[in-house]
Design a protein with these regions (language model features):
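HotDog/MaoC-like acyl-thioester-processing domains
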Residues: 3-81, 139-142, 148-191
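Beta-strand-rich interaction surfaces with strong enrichment in secreted/lumenal proteins
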Residues: 135-137
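Hot-dog-fold acyl-thioester-processing enzymes
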Residues: 1-19, 62-130
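Short beta-strand or tight-loop elements
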Residues: 129-131, 143-145
Length: 191
C-alpha cells in the first residue's frame, strides 16, 4: 500500500493448496481495516475446492521502533543459524519492487516477507500447508540470529496424538541474544 511506507508487518498468515499457480490467477486485495496505526489486508484466490490466501496486519511503528543492542548481536546458536545479508535483501527488494524506506540504507531492517520466505525455504514444508508469523522486533540486515524449534507441551495428550495423523505442526522462534524477533507456526496437512 503506497500510503503505508515505513510501516512494518506485525503478523501474516497464508495458506497454500495443492494446485500450481498460474500467471492468470487473480488475487483481489481487500482492506479490512485501516487507520493511522494499523492496516489489515486480506488477499484470497479460489480455484475449485482449493483456496490460497494471505492475511497481513501492518503497523505504523512511529518513533517507537526499538532494535535492541548491537552488542553481542553477532553471537548465534550453531544448530540453526539465521542471517539475512545485504545482497539477499537488495535482490529481494528489486524483485518485489519494495521501496519502503525502513528497508533502505544504514541500519535497515529485513523485510518481514523475506524472513518468512527464508524460514519456509529452510523448512521445506509439504503442500498443502498454512503458516502464521508474528513479528515482535525488527531484525537489522546482516545481524545474526538462530531458529529455535519448540516442543509441544501436550506430547502425551490423546487428542493431540490423533491430530498428528492429520497434520504436522512446527512452532519456531527466530531469536537473537537480546530478543525474540518472530514467532512462527507452520502446519502441514497430511493427505
Amino acid at each position: 500500500l503506497p500510503d503505508c511506507q515505513g510501516w512494518m508487518i506485525a503478523k501474516c498468515r497464508f495458506s497454500l493448496g495443492n494446485r500450481k499457480m498460474k500467471t492468470s490467477d487473480q488475487f483481489p486485495l481487500q482492506i479490512l481495516k485501516k487507520d493511522g496505526r494499523l492496516a489489515k489486508i486480506h488477499i484470497c484466490s479460489f480455484a475449485g475446492e482449493e483456496k490460497d490466501l494471505l492475511d497481513v496486519t501492518l503497523i505504523n511503528p512511529g518513533q517507537r521502533m526499538t532494535l535492541g543492542s548491537r552488542e553481542n548481536m553477532e553471537t548465534e546458536k550453531e544448530d540453526y543459524p539465521f542471517k539475512v545479508t545485504r545482497e539477499e535483501t537488495d535482490r529481494y527488494l528489486r524483485e518485489v519492487k519494495d521501496q519502503n524506506p525502513i528497508h533502505q540504507g544504514e541500519g535497515a531492517i529485513v523485510p518481514g516477507f523475506l524472513m518468512a520466505n527464508k524460514i519456509l525455504k529452510q523448512l521445506s514444508p509439504q503442500i498443502p500447508f498454512q503458516a502464521e508469523f508474528r513479528f515482535l522486533t525488527p531484525l537489522q540486515i546482516e545481524r545474526s540470529g538462530w531458529l529455535e524449534f519448540l516442543s509441544s507441551d501436550e506430547e502425551n495428550d490423546p487428542k493431540i496424538e490423533a491430530e498428528k495423523a492429520l497434520k504436522k505442526v512446527q512452532k519456531i522462534h527466530l531469536r537473537t541474544p537480546q530478543n525474540i524477533i518472530l514467532k512462527a507456526e507452520i502446519t502441514e496437512y497430511k493427505e
